[in-house]
Design a protein with these regions (language model features):
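Hydrophobic membrane-insertion alpha-helices, especially the h-region
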Residues: 15-29
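Short helix-adjacent coil turns
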Residues: 46, 50-58
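Short solvent-exposed beta->alpha transition segments
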Residues: 34, 41, 56-107
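Beta-lactam-recognizing serine transpeptidase/beta-lactamase-like catalytic domain environment
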Residues: 334-344, 384-434, 439-671, 681
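N-terminal Lys/Arg-rich, disordered targeting/topogenic segments
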Residues: 1-13
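Extracytoplasmic/periplasmic proteins that interact with beta-lactams or build/remodel peptidoglycan
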Residues: 81-377, 397-421, 429
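Sec-dependent signal peptide cleavage junction
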Residues: 27-44
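Short, gly/Ser/Thr-rich active-site loops of penicillin-recognizing serine hydrolases
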Residues: 588-590, 686-700
Length: 700
C-alpha cells in the first residue's frame, strides 16, 4: 500500500512540474507575441541584432515585399559591409517615440548612439513598420543605416595611419624610427621565363617557390602589377662609399644587382620600422611585428587593425601605449560617382609619442663591439643620478630581421645557436664571484661582526673551519700580510671573506641582503630577475654560508641590481634607483634604499676598492689611469658540480667606476663574460673594459 501511494505521489509531482513548464514556455511565447505588437520593442529587437551582427535575424524581421532590398543576400551584404567596415560597436537607441497610423502601420522616431572607427556617432532617425495579424514588420530602407544614405550611395571609410613614435637616446640619436627598406617583387607581365624567374628569386630569398606562386595568383594581380614577395635591407650608397665597406653589404649589393638583371624582378622602396644600432641594442630596444589574431583579441577596442604592428619585445613593448598613436579616420557617404555627400564622423590622426631614454648610443655600440664574440652582458650607469647608460647582451641578433621577416634558415640559425643570441643576459641573475666581496664587507662592518683593521690571520692558500667540513676547503691565490679588509679586497682573498660570512652568521646575512633588495623586484622599467642568496628559503649549511662570503654558494645577482648596490659606495651609503625613461630631461637622482651603509663604512670599503685598481698588486690594476681615479672589483665565479670538478666553467666579472663626482662623464660599469677559464679569467674582462673606458672617458 505504501509503495502504491508513493508512486501515485510521484506521478502527481511530475504532472505539476510538466504543467508548470508548459505555463512558463507559454509565458515566453506570449511575451514574444506581445513584443511583435509593440513597434518600439520590435525596433529595439532589430537594433540588438545589429549589435550582435546577426544579419539573418534582422532580415527575418522585415516586411520583405515593401522593403527596398531585392534579396536576402543583398541585404546581408549591404548591412554587414557597412557596419563591419565602420567597426560599429556599443550600439544603443534612446528617445523612442511611436506613432500609429490609421492603416495599422507605425512610425518610430529614435536617437542612435554607436562607437565607430572614427569615434562616437549620434543621430536621430525614423523607422516605419507595417502591421498584419502576425505583428509589426520593419519596412527597410537604406536610410535606416544612416539618414542621409540612399540606395545608390556608399559608406566610405578612410584611414590615416598614425606614425609610431621614435625611441631616442640621451643625445637625441634615433634608436628606433621610420626607415627605408627594399621590397623585392615581380611584375608578371615582364617575366620572360616564369618558372626560372620564380626559382631564382626563391633561392635568393630562401623561401619556397610555391610561396611566390601563391602571391602571384592573388585576385588583384594583373600583368603590370608589382607583386611584393619579401622585404630586404636597402643598400645605401653611403655604405658603399666608406673606406672599408662591410663585406656583407658588398655581397648583398652583388646579389641584388644579379637579381635586377632578371626580367620581371624589381625593387621598390618601402617605409619600415628601423633599428639603427642593430645587434648592439636589440635585446634592449626589441622589435615590432604585425599583429596576430590573438593580439587583436587581447587588445580589442584599443585601435589595432589587421595591418597594425605591435611591440613584441624590449622597449617596443614596454612603451607600446605611448609609441603606438591613434590612426585618423573619416567615415563619409559618397554618391554613385564617388562624390562626398556628407561626413558621418571624423577622428584626426594622433601620432605616437617619442620616447627619450637615458642610454648613450655610442657607449652601447662600443660595449657591443668589444664583447660581441663573447657570451656576456654589460650594464653602465651614472652612479650619482641612476641614469642607465648602457644595457648590452652578447651575442646578439639584428632586430631589423624580425621586422622585414626571416626565412626558415635564418630563424633556425638563431634559435638553434648554442651561444643563444636571443637570450637576454642582462635581465638574468648570475653567480657574482668576488664582485660580491665588497657587499659582504659592508654588511659585516654594519652589523659589527668585525672592523676594517681586524687581522683575520694568514691561513696560507687553503683553509677550513674545522674537521666537520671533511675534505672541503676554501682556497685563495695570494699570500699576504696583514690580513685586513683593505688587503683582502686588493688581493681578492676568498678565505678572508669566507671567515667574514661566518662571523656575520646566516640569519644576519640573509636579513641584511633582504634589506638591500634581495628576493624582491628591482624598481626598474624593464623587469629583471630577482637576486637570491639561496635556491631554497635560506642559507642552510655552514659551508654554503662560507661560500656565500666570496660570491659563490647559491648567490645569484642581477648585474643592474649589483650596480645599484655599488652606487652606495659613492653616495654616502645610499643606494640609487636606476632609471631608463628620461622624463622631461631631468637628471636628478632618486634614492632606492636610504642608509644601506654608513658613510664611515663606505670610506673603509672604498679604500680597498681603490686599491684594487690603483695598487700594482690589485687584480684590476690593468684598468688604472693617470688622469681619472677609478675604483672597482674583479670577480671570477666558478661553475662546477663539486670542488674537485675540473670540467666546470668560469664567469669573469669586472665592476669599475669613476670616484670623483666632478668627473665630466661619471660612470659605473659592470661587465660579465661566460667561459673565461682559458682566456685569462677576469683579466680578460678588465682588458675589454679598459678599452671601453679609454674611449668613453677620453682625456679629461
Amino acid at each position: 500500500m505504501r509503495k502504491k501511494k508513493r508512486k501515485k505521489h510521484t506521478k502527481t509531482i511530475t504532472k505539476i512540474v510538466l504543467f508548470s513548464g508548459i505555463l512558463i514556455g507559454g509565458g515566453i511565447g506570449i511575451v514574444t507575441i506581445m513584443n511583435r505588437n509593440v513597434p518600439e520593442k520590435r525596433l529595439m529587437e532589430y537594433m540588438k541584432y545589429i549589435e550582435k551582427g546577426e544579419y539573418e535575424q534582422m532580415y527575418a524581421m522585415l516586411d520583405q515585399k515593401k522593403s527596398s532590398m531585392n534579396s536576402k543576400e543583398e541585404f546581408i551584404e549591404r548591412n554587414s559591409k557597412i557596419y563591419e567596415g565602420i567597426e560599429m560597436s556599443d550600439l544603443s537607441i534612446t528617445d523612442i517615440t511611436a506613432k500609429r497610423k490609421e492603416n495599422g502601420n507605425a512610425a518610430v522616431s529614435y536617437t542612435t548612439n554607436m562607437q565607430t572607427a572614427a569615434g562616437n556617432v549620434e543621430f536621430t532617425n525614423n523607422a516605419v513598420f507595417s502591421h498584419n495579424w502576425t505583428g509589426y514588420h520593419l519596412i527597410w530602407q537604406d536610410q535606416l543605416i544612416f539618414p542621409e544614405l540612399s540606395a545608390t550611395d556608399k559608406v566610405q571609410v578612410t584611414l590615416e595611419e598614425a606614425k609610431r613614435g621614435n625611441i631616442l637616446d640621451r643625445n637625441g640619436r634615433q634608436l628606433a624610427g621610420e626607415g627605408t627598406a627594399s621590397s623585392v617583387g615581380i611584375v608578371p607581365g615582364r617575366m620572360e621565363n616564369r618558372e626560372d624567374t620564380i626559382k631564382k628569386l626563391a633561392e635568393y630569398l630562401g623561401i619556397g617557390a610555391d610561396e611566390i606562386e601563391d602571391k602571384l595568383k592573388a585576385d588583384w594581380v594583373k600583368a603590370d602589377s608589382f607583386v611584393p614577395v619579401a622585404t630586404i635591407p636597402k643598400i645605401q650608397e653611403v655604405d658603399l662609399l666608406t673606406v672599408n665597406p662591410d663585406e656583407t653589404v658588398l655581397e648583398e649589393k652583388e646579389k641584388q644587382d644579379t637579381l635586377l638583371k632578371i626580367p620581371g624582378i624589381m625593387l621598390s622602396d618601402v617605409k619600415v620600422r628601423t633599428y639603427y644600432l642593430k645587434e648592439a641594442a636589440s635585446h634592449l630596444v626589441g622589435y615590432v611585428q604585425a599583429v596576430t589574431a590573438e593580439d587583436l583579441q587581447e587588445h580589442k577596442g584599443e585601435g589595432y587593425r589587421t595591418n597594425s604592428v605591435i611591440g613584441k619585445t624590449g622597449l617596443e613593448t614596454l612603451y607600446e601605449k605611448e609609441l603606438k598613436g591613434t590612426d585618423g579616420c573619416e567615415i563619409c557617404i559618397v554618391d554613385a560617382n564617388g562624390n562626398k555627400k556628407s561626413v558621418i564622423a571624423y577622428e584626426p590622426r594622433k601620432d605616437g609619442e617619442d620616447i627619450h631614454i637615458t642610454i648613450d648610443g655610442d657607449l652601447q655600440s662600443t660595449l657591443y663591439e668589444q664583447f660581441k664574440e663573447d657570451r656576456g652582458c654589460s650594464v653602465a650607469l651614472n652612479p650619482y643620478t641612476g641614469e642607465v647608460l648602457a644595457l648590452v647582451s652578447t651575442p646578439s641578433y639584428d632586430n631589423n630581421d624580425f621586422v622585414r621577416g626571416m626565412d626558415n634558415s635564418q630563424w633556425s640559425a638563431l634559435n638553434e645557436n648554442e651561444d643563444r643570441p636571443l637570450y637576454n643576459r642582462f635581465r638574468q641573475t648570475w653567480c657574482p664571484g668576488s664582485t660580491f666581496k665588497p657587499v659582504i664587507a659592508a654588511i659585516g662592518l654594519k652589523v659589527g661582526a668585525f672592523t676594517a683593521n681586524d687581522d683575520f690571520g694568514n691561513e696560507g692558500l687553503a683553509w677550513q673551519k674545522d674537521s666537520s667540513w671533511g675534505d672541503y676547503t676554501v682556497t685563495t691565490l695570494h699570500d699576504y700580510e696583514p690580513v685586513i679588509l683593505k688587503n683582502a679586497l686588493i688581493y681578492s682573498d676568498n678565505i678572508y671573506f669566507a671567515k667574514a660570512a661566518l662571523k656575520i652568521g646566516a640569519d644576519q646575512l640573509m636579513q641584511s641582503l633582504n634589506q638591500i633588495g634581495f628576493n624582491q623586484e628591482l624598481p626598474f622599467d624593464i623587469k629583471m630577475s630577482e637576486s637570491q642568496y639561496s635556491n631554497m628559503d635560506k642559507i642552510e649549511t655552514e659551508i654554503q654560508l662560507a661560500d656565500s662570503g666570496y660570491g659563490q654558494g647559491q648567490i645569484l645577482v642581477n648585474p643592474l641590481h649589483l650596480a645599484s648596490i655599488y652606487t652606495a659606495f659613492l653616495n654616502d651609503g645610499n643606494m640609487i634607483k636606476p632609471y631608463l625613461h628620461a622624463d622631461g630631461g631631468s637628471t636628478s637622482s632618486e634614492i632606492w634604499i636610504k642608509d644601506a651603509f654608513s658613510p664611515q663604512i663606505v670610506s673603509e670599503v672604498m679604500e680597498g676598492l681603490e686599491g684594487v685598481v690603483n695598487n700594482p698588486e690589485g687584480t684590476g690594476y690593468g684598468a688604472c689611469r693617470e688622469d681619472i681615479r677609478l675604483a672597482g672589483k674583479t670577480g671570477t665565479a666558478e661553475l662546477k658540480a663539486t670542488k674537485e670538478d675540473t670540467s666546470g666553467t668560469e664567469i669573469g666579472w669586472f665592476t669599475v667606476f669613476t670616484t670623483d663626482r666632478d668627473t665630466k662623464n661619471p660612470i659605473l660599469l659592470i661587465s660579465m663574460v661566460e667561459n673565461v677559464k682559458d682566456i685569462g679569467g677576469s683579466g680578460y674582462v678588465v682588458e675589454k673594459d679598459k678599452a671601453i673606458l679609454d674611449e668613453y672617458l677620453g682625456n679629461e
